[in-house]
Amino acid sequence: MSEHTTSQTQVTVTLPDGESRSFPFGTTGYDIARSIGKKLAQDALAVVINGRAQDLDSPVSEDASIEIVTFDHPLGKEIFWHSASHIMAHAIEELFPGSRFGAGPAIEQGFYYDIASSHRFTESDLHDIETRMIEIGRRAIDVRREELSRQAAIDFFSSTRKDPYKVEILEDTLKDTPTVSIYHQGEFADLCTGPHLPNTSKLKAVKLTNISASFWRGDSSRESMQRIYGIAFPSEKLLKQHLAHIEEAKKRDHRKLGAELELFMLSPEVGSGLPIWLPKGAIVRNELESFLREEQRKRGYVPVYTPHIGNIGLYKRSGHYPYYSESQFPPLTYTDDLGREEQYLLKPMNCPHHHMIYSSKLRSYRDLPIRLTEFGTVYRHEQSGELNGLIRARGFTQDDSHIYCRPDQLVDEICNAIDLTKFVFATLGFDDIQIRLSLHDPENQDKYGGTKEVWEQAEKDVREAADRMNIDYFTGIGEASFYGPKIDFIVRDAIGRKWQLGTVQVDYVMPERFDLSYIGSDGQPHRPVIIHRAPFGSMERFIGVLIEHTGGNFPLWLAPVQIAVLPITDEVHDYAVQVRDTLHAAGMRVELDTRSEKIGKKIRESEVAKIPYMVIIGQKEAAAGEVSLRRHREGDQGNMTVEELKEKLAKEINDKS
């Protein structure tokens, strides 16, 4: 048999543990899972072939690295929940004929679908839909992907499905896409890129959680729709665990704790999605910003400030407009005294402003890297149904930095940015972190700025940095920004939820668009490379997640009130004031409770306020020049002098422990 023939009949598959196996040409992901083990084949949801998530029945037609996706895989829940949204739409279509469907994505905790229906859904309908979803699961309906021309898809959704929403997407959003994919599930079908579950039997448990109003394509001037949220699992046990987590999450809800602990407020008079920081919340935010500022200073960053608005031409040049136009506030139009019209945007990104700072003077290769940093407020017109306190807001502040470097400095700078982000998360108690290399989709190159060669180089650099830092990561094809690949940090909180927070992103595109340059050692102009970097992501979202992660029990260095001084009787008032003043002079945040209340009530109220330490002072302590120390949730810590207390607390604050 010739070498050529062998290469056509066999493929070499590399598994995640590095093992290589040979399989017949055209072997599917399911075949590979079955060859590894019966249990893996039963649990398999999809397959990742050379970094791209695909349906489990996808054939392997070349040598490839392979990952079998189960529910616990980094991509597993997203794929499962996306398929569950299709099963929900299928159930609704059977129960409420004539319903039509808008968007139906997986989200951080479950899925939703936007529905156009003459039926007004109520909470009582949710149980019927859940029951029908489980029934569809029991039918074990095969899910089939069909690829067809855009025109054939338009004909299908016009005549067979009678779905004007998908026709609009095909004629508008996908007008330049020659081939599209449809997923069929019995009588149900939808326009979708996938991947999806191989059949509906994987769904064993479901809970529909909420109904809200929405609009087609998020545009309030378009048709109103109804959005149903839900979550689903491959077992009842997992659903029960999730519901228990939901109860715990309600106790930790940052909106509830934010009000109880007086951290922030939301005011309809101010506007939806525009949180206001109260004094105690401002302390938490200021401490976090100061922490990052100092760490950045040590690492060579320099601060800048930029305006809250910018000329629309700036964002057209960067591509943020019209690329993000659907999530931006409408342009502000200004006419000067001469009748000349200018348009401005509320700043959707800090990046273009920083690029203008870089380009404001001639740069030498010796000047690089230049690391600009700003806590810059940006604005996004998020849909009202998606707003969620601090975690999803319309106005928020990014800890935004841009590093301008030479190509030979790039990998080192990416490594430094990764190191800083890991340090920030470790300091704040996020120990369970997944890292995703978010790459572009080469089959949809038109979605991205820059050439194929530029993207290949950028992704090579990102992989090299991740490998050098010895971090475990998974890849997400199609998850890149339009101007570059990125490293996304996904943290798991105290009750197991995942949150995407920090990011490090490589950008070869913006230097071209903004004609950025430096003079090299050869005396000629060269393009720098940009790294976009934000460990927190946004201050609002990060603090919202931190509140829920800690349950409002902030570490001492972050707590708005660090110590409550609680005198037992009025006779020790003067000594209590001395203790308060001594701790305050040492830079600690102290409250003195002089009310004529029983000490038990004072302690209970301090516990409810989640104040880390309580200093109890009675006549015995005052006479001895001591205090009795209590720790929140831990109780009595013993007696000590004020000086010993000051040293103990100062060490804990400085260590950020």
Curated annotation (Swiss-Prot):
The reply on keyword RNA-binding is yes
- Segment Catalytic: which positions? 253-555
Cofactor(s) needed by this chain: Zn(2+)
Q: Which HAMAP family match?
A: Thr_tRNA_synth
Gene name linked to the record = thrS
Q: What is this protein called?
A: Threonine--tRNA ligase
Which PROSITE patterns does UniProt cross-reference here? AA_TRNA_LIGASE_II, TGS
> Where is Zn(2+) bound in this sequence?
351, 402, 532
Q: Which domain of life is it from?
A: Bacteria
InterPro entries, per database record:
aa-tRNA-synt_IIb, aa-tRNA-synth_II, aa-tRNA-synth_II/BPL/LPL, Anticodon-bd, Anticodon-bd_dom_sf, Beta-grasp_dom_sf, TGS, TGS-like
Q: One matching Pfam family, short form?
A: tRNA-synt_2b
List the keywords (alphabetical): Aminoacyl-tRNA synthetase, ATP-binding, Cytoplasm, Ligase, Metal-binding, Nucleotide-binding, Protein biosynthesis, RNA-binding, tRNA-binding, Zinc
Xref: PANTHER family: THREONINE--TRNA LIGASE, CHLOROPLASTIC_MITOCHONDRIAL 2 (PTHR11451:SF44), THREONINE-TRNA LIGASE (PTHR11451)
Say yes or no: keyword Cell wall biogenesis/degradation present.
no
**Which SMART domains does the UniProt entry name for this protein?**
tRNA_SAD (SM00863)
This entry's comment on the bound cofactor is: Binds 1 zinc ion per subunit.
